[in-house]
Amino acid sequence: MSGLRPAISTFIFLLLITGGVYPLLTTVLGQWWFPWQANGSLIREGDTVRGSALIGQNFTDNGYFQGRPSATAEMPYNPQASGGSNLAVSNPELDKQIAARVAALRAANPDTSTSVPAELVTASASGLDNNITPQAAAWQIPRVAKARNLSVEQLTQLIAKYSQQPLVKYIGQPVVNIVELNLALDKLDE
């Protein structure tokens, strides 16, 4: 019985620290130092939430830039079912999916002569990725320009404006947040 008392007191102590103090402390510090990030990095227009800067959306209209395909269950970009397709590179099903995506992108982008960027036909590990490279966004410019009656130059400048450089210059590559880019496109129409 004497060995049980230290075990119980250690359990209660660790329960209070890891189940109470630590979560409360990280929540308070997160809200204090990083309130936007701690609340989901929500993009708002007035009182309306238009999306999150962290989660992609399923843009299918020709007037919008499209992000990476989503492999989430039930519906594209479902944040409650985050995950990749888990298909191996050697899996024939993955080849079929990629071929179908390439064909769909070619059909939607007939004015683009270069090859389809790989990131536009392969899902990310989370299935929720909202970033693509500026080159993948630029590949879609002819379609978006035609659908929105905008110039190639306007869209090129918009992509440059919304391109984000990596935190460390030589690690990573520039990316464009598709949700923010498409919301900026909507503002051009206003």
From Swiss-Prot:
UniProt keyword list: ATP-binding, Cell inner membrane, Cell membrane, Ion transport, Membrane, Nucleotide-binding, Potassium, Potassium transport, Transmembrane, Transmembrane helix, Transport
Major localisation: membrane
Protein location: Cell inner membrane
Membrane association type: Single-pass membrane protein
Transmembrane spans: 10-30
Cellular-component GO terms for this entry: plasma membrane
An example molecular function term from Gene Ontology annotations: ATP binding
Family annotation (InterPro entries): KdpC
Function: Part of the high-affinity ATP-driven potassium transport (or Kdp) system, which catalyzes the hydrolysis of ATP coupled with the electrogenic transport of potassium into the cytoplasm. This subunit acts as a catalytic chaperone that increases the ATP-binding affinity of the ATP-hydrolyzing subunit KdpB by the formation of a transient KdpB/KdpC/ATP ternary complex.
Family label: Belongs to the KdpC family.
Summary of subunit composition and partner proteins: The system is composed of three essential subunits: KdpA, KdpB and KdpC.
Protein's recorded name: Potassium-transporting ATPase KdpC subunit
Species assigned in the record: Shigella dysenteriae serotype 1 (strain Sd197)
Gene that produces this protein: kdpC
